[in-house]
From Swiss-Prot:
Oligomeric form and interacting partners: Part of the 50S ribosomal subunit; part of the 5S rRNA/L5/L18/L25 subcomplex. Contacts the 5S rRNA. Binds to the 5S rRNA independently of L5 and L18.
Sequence similarity: Belongs to the bacterial ribosomal protein bL25 family. CTC subfamily.
Cystine connections: none
GO cellular component: cytosolic large ribosomal subunit
CDD domains per UniProt: Ribosomal_L25_TL5_CTC (cd00495)
Organism in which the protein naturally occurs: Pelotomaculum thermopropionicum (strain DSM 13744 / JCM 10971 / SI)
Encoding gene, per UniProt annotation: rplY
Extent of Low complexity compositional bias: 184-209
GO molecular function, one term: structural constituent of ribosome
Name of this protein: Large ribosomal subunit protein bL25
Keywords from the named record: Ribonucleoprotein, Ribosomal protein, RNA-binding, rRNA-binding
Length: 209
């Protein structure tokens, strides 16, 4: 599903202008690509936040850019966002204009589901790769790759080559790179046996009467 976002072209880049944008709920942003060059814009922070929360950071966005009384429409991806370090509010965004006919690179999160059989045997489930670099059409970027770990026993590993990728999606990572594994848990060290004839360990001292 393609999200929609309106943008306003801007020429001013002063701090006071940026402050006035944020007072209106807008943030400065930049969109770049072969059909737009590098264009400074402003977008509604709340609308962008809704897209990020609902469709994820890899969402394909149909952007309507208002400039000099005209509207230009472009397909874009969110390249980077900046947030206030304290309040975590959006303060800036970069967008990359893409063609629906071209393949793009995207970093997709890996989600684990199920309870590994090996953990019942005392093993430890260890995620090793939480995000995977992939290549596909801009309209086919998966929101996440879900991996079922239910069948993993101690010593088992799921690699990049084992990931259930949708048709048309190709992983760019090393196929042998481990994604998740189950290792044997550490056993508590056994107490050394007392030597034959050794005196028992002294107990707490008793006060003399």
């Amino acid at each position: 599903m393609t999200a929609e976002l309106e943008a306003q072209a801007r020429t001013e880049k002063t701090r006071s202008f940026t402050h006035s944008l944020r007072e209106k709920g807008m943030i400065p942003a930049v969109v770049y690509g072969k059909n737009v060059g590098s264009l400074s814009i402003a977008v509604d922070a709340g609308e962008l936040q809704k897209i990020l929360e609902g469709a994820g950071s890899n969402a394909l966005i149909r952007m309507k850019i208002k400039e000099n009384g005209k509207i230009r429409k472009h397909n874009v991806l969110v390249k980077e966002v900046q947030r206030d370090p304290v309040r975590r509010e959006l303060i800036h965004a970069d967008f990359h204009q893409v063609s629906l006919k071209d393949r793009v690179h995207a970093t997709v999160p890996v989600h684990l589901t199920g309870s590994a059989a090996g953990t019942v045997e005392g093993g430890v489930l260890t995620p090793l790769l939480r995000r995977v670099e992939m290549e596909c059409l801009a309209s086919e970027i998966p929101e996440a790759i879900t991996v079922d770990v239910s069948g993993l026993r101690i010593g088992d590993t799921i690699t990049v080559a084992d990931l259930p990728l949708p048709p048309g999606v190709r992983a760019l990572e090393d196929p042998e790179a481990p994604v998740v594994t189950v290792t044997a848990g550490e056993r508590p060290a056994a107490e050394p046996a007392a030597a034959p004839g050794a005196a028992p360990a002294a107990g707490p001292e008793e006060a003399e009467e």
